[in-house]
């Protein structure tokens, strides 16, 4: 009986209307969902933190300034190592903004009873599609038709050329999906596991003193796994920008 009314682990990812407005004159309905709300909140937090840190910048750095500088240095190192020290500087603002946006949405999703926007493939696919499309346009802009040499492996036998070109083309197009799917799948699976474990632990611990003591074991695991999820939030943000820089480098150098 203690396992009745099991909560669906997918319920936390449901997109719901928080506010809606119907304009009957022009037959228009405007709504604000929890998905859009958390995107707006993350953007406001990012802008506010950066403005406050910049405004309060002093000769002796505080913890907030040191955190920002550490993130700045980490992203800058990724851009320089993945692209190059000369052309990489041009794309650093975009990569830095992309990292901060993904990281902030990942962290907001870790707050209990909040909404994780990066667990939705529609958002991560939109970002990954934009990145790959932009890298493709960049490659055509710099190399024109020579950009197609990216799909021709060096030293390829002539007989295998059509097959390998097709494989390279499919692999290139799959970047649109794989880049976003990797992020959303990792965030989604981690949040689902936390919900399942939390619901299971709560039902055990609320069944009596003996079960309460037993429930301390999975409760400790939940806290440990929450720390792991915090690390994953940072790691997945960095993996996303590393691959983004790699795609930009491929378009610039054709390899």
From Swiss-Prot:
Residues 1-7 form a propeptide. The keyword Flavoprotein does not apply. Keywords: ATP synthesis, CF(0), Hydrogen ion transport, Ion transport, Membrane, Mitochondrion, Mitochondrion inner membrane, Transmembrane, Transmembrane helix, Transport. InterPro entries: ATP_synth_F0_asu, ATP_synth_F0_asu_AS, ATP_synth_F0_asu_bact/mt, F0_ATP_A_sf. One of its GO terms (cellular component) is proton-transporting ATP synthase complex. It is a multi-pass membrane protein. It is found in: Mitochondrion inner membrane. Gene3D superfamilies: ATP synthase, F0 complex, subunit A. CDD domains: ATP-synt_Fo_a_6. The chain crosses the membrane at residues 35-55, 91-111, 120-140, 147-167, 177-197, 208-228. GO terms for molecular function: proton-transporting ATP synthase activity, rotational mechanism. Mitochondrial membrane ATP synthase (F(1)F(0) ATP synthase or Complex V) produces ATP from ADP in the presence of a proton gradient across the membrane which is generated by electron transport complexes of the respiratory chain. F-type ATPases consist of two structural domains, F(1) - containing the extramembraneous catalytic core and F(0) - containing the membrane proton channel, linked together by a central stalk and a peripheral stalk. During catalysis, ATP synthesis in the catalytic domain of F(1) is coupled via a rotary mechanism of the central stalk subunits to proton translocation. Belongs to the ATPase A chain family. F-type ATPases have 2 components, CF(1) - the catalytic core - and CF(0) - the membrane proton channel. CF(1) has five subunits: alpha(3), beta(3), gamma(1), delta(1), epsilon(1). CF(0) has three main subunits: a, b and c. This is ATP synthase subunit a. It comes from Trichophyton rubrum (Athlete's foot fungus). The gene is ATP6.
């Amino acid at each position: 009986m203690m396992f009745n009314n099991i909560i669906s682990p997918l319920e936390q990812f449901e997109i719901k209307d928080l506010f809606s407005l119907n304009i009957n004159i022009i037959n228009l309905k405007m709504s604000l969902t929890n998905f859009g709300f958390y995107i707006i909140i993350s953007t406001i937090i990012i802008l506010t933190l950066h403005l406050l840190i910049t405004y309060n910048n002093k000769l002796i750095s505080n913890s907030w300034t040191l955190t920002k500088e550490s993130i700045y240095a980490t992203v800058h190192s990724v851009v320089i190592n993945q692209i190059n020290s000369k052309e990489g500087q041009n794309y650093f603002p975009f990569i830095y903004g992309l990292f901060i946006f993904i990281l902030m949405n990942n962290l907001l999703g870790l707050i209990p009873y909040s909404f994780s926007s990066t667990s939705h493939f529609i958002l991560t696919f939109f970002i990954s599609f934009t990145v790959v499309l932009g890298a493709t346009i960049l490659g055509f802009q710099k190399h024109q038709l020579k950009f197609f040499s990216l799909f021709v492996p060096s030293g390829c036998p002539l007989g295998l050329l059509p097959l390998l070109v097709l494989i390279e083309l499919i692999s290139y197009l799959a970047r649109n999906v794989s880049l976003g799917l990797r992020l959303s799948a990792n965030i989604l699976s981690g949040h689902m596991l936390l919900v399942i474990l939390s619901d299971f632990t709560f039902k055990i611990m609320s069944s009596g003193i003996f079960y309460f003591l037993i429930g301390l074991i999975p409760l400790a695991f939940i806290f440990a796994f929450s720390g792991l999820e915090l690390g994953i939030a940072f790691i997945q943000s960095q993996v996303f920008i590393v691959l983004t820089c790699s795609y930009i480098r491929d378009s610039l150098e054709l390899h």
